Amino acid sequence: MYKRQLLPLLDQPCPVERMSVVYALGRNPCPTAVEKLVSLLETDDNAYVRRATAWSLANYDNQIVLKPLINALKNDVAAVRLWSSSSLAEIGNVSLRNAQLAAEQLLISLKIDNEPGVRSNCIWSLCRLYEKLNNTFQESFVDECTKIALFDKEPSVMEEAKTALDSMGMQGFYN
C-alpha cells in the first residue's frame, strides 16, 4: 500500500525528492510504478533522477524497461549510461531474447563509448549475460575483450577485459 503512496511524489518539482522516491521504488519494486519510472528515464530534465531511475529499473523485469534502458545507454550522459549498462545485465537475464537485445547494444557501447566507467560496466554486464548468448555473439565478445586487454589505452578497462576473459575460462589468453 505505501508504495502506491510514493507514486504521486514522482511528480514533485524538487529533483532530490523525485530521486529519493525513485531509489525507494528500486529497493521496493511496485509494478504500478514501472511506466512512470520509464517516463522519468526518458524525459526527466535532471540527470541525477535519470541515473537513479536507470538503477531502479534493474529491479523491474517488465519487458517495457528494456528499450528505454538501451536508449539511455546510447544517448544519455555518462552517469546514466553507466547505470543503464548495469541494469541491462539484470533485465537481460530475464529471457534469452532480452539477453540478446541487451548484449547487442552493450557490445556496441563497449566499442564506441568514450567513458571508461561505462565501457567497464559494459564488459561486466556482457559477462553476466555470456551464457545466454549465441556462440557467434560469444565469440565476438571474446574477440573484443582480447583486443581491449591487449591494446586499450585505459588501464581500468584493460583490467576489466582481462578479468572477463579469466571468468570465461581464458586465463592468460591475452598474454
Predicted features, each with a name:
Residues P13-C14, D45-N46, D76-V77, N114-E115, ...:
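Short inter-helical turns and helix N-cap capping residues of alpha-solenoid HEAT/ARM repeat scaffolds
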Residues K3-D11, C30-E42, N62-K74, N93-L110, ...:
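Amphipathic alpha-helical scaffolding segments comprising HEAT/armadillo-like alpha-solenoid repeats
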Residues V80-W83, E144-K153:
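Short, highly charged low-complexity linear segments
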Residues P8, V16-C30, S39, Y48-N62, ...:
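Structural detector for internal amphipathic alpha-helices that build alpha-solenoid repeat scaffolds
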